[in-house]
């Protein structure tokens, strides 16, 4: 496999025909790879790249476990962390979290620093709470954040609150509560928390296949309920899920990845013949009883994945009408009084641009099947652009993703020369013809693919952008049809993860966009 094929310069006078042939060949390679990686059940599910967060937490949990083999697994985790794992730097909280977790796993003794003002953001404050709880449990000093007594009070109040939380978030909250109560000597309170934790454990020993939740639960269980079946199963799961390189990986997302892949590749003849039907069947089967879809099989529905599934299932040869009606009813039920949608069915979860846009787009695609009002949501998105000069996605980093995913909620034809968001994105192109994740960054294939898709959706049809962006994708495509990727998806926010399946689909999305433009123009951009 080569890192990328070198594309010879193409004389402008003879540009379109050879460029279209090369683009068609690149699409064939990309489609072939998508079909080759489809699973037997019709889904796509990729193992994300390693990062410090999961490996450090799992290493820490096993290093403190007396279970046979735990010490050897912890040493393998430490070896990977020592070998050059670097904390993420795109966001101060991400950097602080990974710096602290690496230090805790390697027992280097530095204070756990949660002093950055960004930790006070409502969506990120739980990260400070997690770090402070683990630091207290391991007798590590902290810099910033709540004093131990205040941390204890906040955790106790959160545990007692009637607000609905994601189930894995609830496990993490109970785990932190148990660790802090143990620090203060209240073993009875800690034991009560571990019973609640154990009630959420799967037969395999994990908690929603999430290594972060499972490692935190392991710390709490082995400290407050040593020797119990729940503690043993949790430890056994951590041992079994460690990969050969010593790492643990973030949770996979088969439903989300399948909806995205189906959305992007549907319409390619080979894909429609060999993959689309099985993907549709998988999504239909993955629908939850409440009508929504989960980001991965077996967990609760979220509005982003529900909208993504409805978008992917729109059009001919889609899902049964009953499936679509149930999904639309779920979105109708999830609409907040102000006409918006959260990502999760959780109290306090704020609305974010990409989720609102996905829901509006899904409802637009099925407009004849529902009466859900979307004007307030569309106005909210327009207001966000007016206030900020751009959109910010809640679940993926970067201007290209936010622009590409929000624009379908608007009518590009309403703006002569294209939507202002698309024009602004076009102007961020780098000299090599590609686009960066954020202005000033180097070009990446996924940002370039997203930008090309956004220009199509935003009505910007300048031939230069399409031609140069396409050349960048042709130049960087590997022989197996894939492209090099970068961490792009947030989870848990603000940490980033790289999912190869998502990188492939989002990059190919731009390739499809340019090819459609070339074909519509009769072979010229």
For each predicted feature, which ranges?
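An alpha-helical repeat/solenoid feature that recognizes helix-turn-helix modules
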Residues: 2-29, 44-75, 83-153, 161-186, ...
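N-terminal signal-anchor module of multipass membrane proteins
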Residues: 30-40
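Assembly/interface hotspot detector across virion components, adhesins/toxins, and nucleic-acid enzymes
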Residues: 36-38, 240, 287
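Short linear, low-complexity motifs centered on an aromatic residue
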Residues: 181-197
